[in-house]
């Protein structure tokens, strides 16, 4: 929970709180906390367990939400023990809203965390690595053993922190950059020129 303290003045948005494993620590902080949960039973539990959150529990699908409406367009820290099956989609959503998400922390599958933090030349370096590191500083904080869970999952977990780089400018069209990165890594067997030719058309050298 302390990983959110990089920006202590900002409100917190927790994604997928479930039964409040992380929420119980977040509500003790002297900050505005909102949670987004799509599961009805979890929402009912949270309302009963954390009455102080009553007006800040949002029953919705995070991936479909307009994040600019959550805190009147103001920035916030994104956190959560993210559902492993949609963690990549959550981070793509973060990138689409990077103007209001200066920091993102949380627990994800160890394999995904390693991909996000991977450097150029690494076997795990890919789309997530390039796109997130283009705008955020990535810190792989620590590994979480599967044995701390009951029942234990089949995979290890990891906690990471991504802090937006305020000084870095790409100097190119962001939409085109994302398209080139995704196309290039999805067609690794092709030469770079052949991969991006359909995108650039006549401008491709």
Write out the residue ranges for each language-model feature.
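Catalytic cores of RNA-modifying enzymes
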Residues: 1-179
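Flexible helical/loop "lid" subdomain adjacent to adenine-nucleotide binding pockets
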Residues: 159-205
